[in-house]
Amino acid sequence: MKIKVLLLAFGCSMMSFGAYAQKGVDTGTPFGSGEDSVRCITNISLFVPYAKAGNFKDAYEFWYQAYTECPGAHKDIYLYGVRIMDWKINTEKDPAKKAALIDDLMKVYDTRVKYFGNDRKYGKDWIIARKAADYIRLKGDNADPKVYYAWLGEVINEFGENSEAMGVSCLLYTSPSPRDVEESR
């Protein structure tokens, strides 16, 4: 009788662990909890070597799982995520899908700001400067100056003279010269 009670108690406790296994994005923890934390660490461990080797095709699925389930777990999700998304954008032939992938890349930058924007060396200003540079590079003539001016202007207003040089450079490089403004009148 005692064995049946113990087995029943053990079975009930094992089933309840599934209820506690939540994704990091849901719980606000870096790795989640329970089985999800193991899956998160596994996905990070699997995509990083592929990405380091430049094998972005094999890295993508593992990276995407880590990015969506435990976005605050590790900076590598964003360091390699930008490269993986850039690869996907450059290999995509359909213009509509390419535009959607560019939007997804911009979201990767936004998510990095959310989780790692307070990094001392590579903080919000550094991240937004790279976001704007990639937006301009990938959109080309279709880049909307109002969009990246808003991003860069916010960062420059927030950080002032301590703003990332690349952000200031992007803003100045893409700003119309006084002569261009005069000619457009």
Please identify what each model-predicted range represents.
Residues 35-43, 74, 122-130, 160-169, ...:
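Generic helix N-cap/helix-start motif at coil->alpha-helix transitions
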Residues 173-180:
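Conserved small/polar residues in nucleotide/adenosyl-binding loops
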Residues 87-93, 132-142:
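Short coil/turn linking the two alpha-helices of tandem helical-hairpin repeats
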Residues 22-80, 84-90, 95, 99, ...:
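N-terminal leader/linker segments that initiate helical-solenoid repeat arrays
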Residues 1-30, 82:
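Bacterial Sec-dependent N-terminal signal peptides
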Residues 32, 67-72, 111-123, 157-163:
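Flexible helix-coil transition and linker loops at the boundaries of alpha-helical arrays
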